[in-house]
Amino acid sequence: MTEAREAVLSPTDVKTILGLCSAEGVLVGGQALAFWVDHLGVRRPQELEIAVTADADFIGDSALAKKLGEALGWKWWIPNLDDATPQTGKVTHTLADGSIKQIDLLSGVIGLTTLDVKRRAIDMDVPEIGPLRVMHPIDVLDSRIHNLDLLPGKRNAAGIAQGALATAMVRAFISHELESRGERVALKLLERVAAVAAEPGAVRIFLLYGIDPLNAIPLEDFRTNAALHTKLWPQITERVSAQREKMRRLIQTAKSRRK
């Protein structure tokens, strides 16, 4: 039996879904990346020009799945208590050609703690949509890296392009925060990105695909913190570079032993 093809949500679909969801769930995954990319005016690569992702993912409960399904007139499904799934619900709509549009409601995202994702999510008031909770940009980057590291099905051209796009998006976000809220706030974001870059999964993904979270730091925009340039940043790059070299050698040794 052939698995049904996933249909891409149209911009109108996404706007309607976000408006219905309001702030009841947290927008995560590829649609969170797409939201921030558009909000910050980041250029999409050719691979993601038509759509960053096909579906929409939210951290939310079964009541939200029911609400979305009924409001959209789409089918909705809620798992049984004994179903082994991270989904709390799913909303689908089958098109005439058999392809399926879908929304996933999740208890969490791989590699990140749900409580932290909810705590760091940013509340927005979006024109033509209304109130919305969106996954923090750095969590978006972190989740794209975890997907590439932990989910073989994500290691494709689109998944790699999402990782690179998330890096550019976070760079734009930090530049915006620098300009609007100052270096003290932006420095905390820099330190969080540095922590992401030092994670073993991020080190592996850098070695495999060249996706470098440190490229998300607009270092030249930090103009008043001399200690950052003379002390902190050299320490960060030295530490991350050492971890990358250590893992590179481990990978090379493992390959040699398999020969």
Task: Report each predicted region and the residues it spans.
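Compositionally biased terminal segments of proteins
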Residues: M1-K259
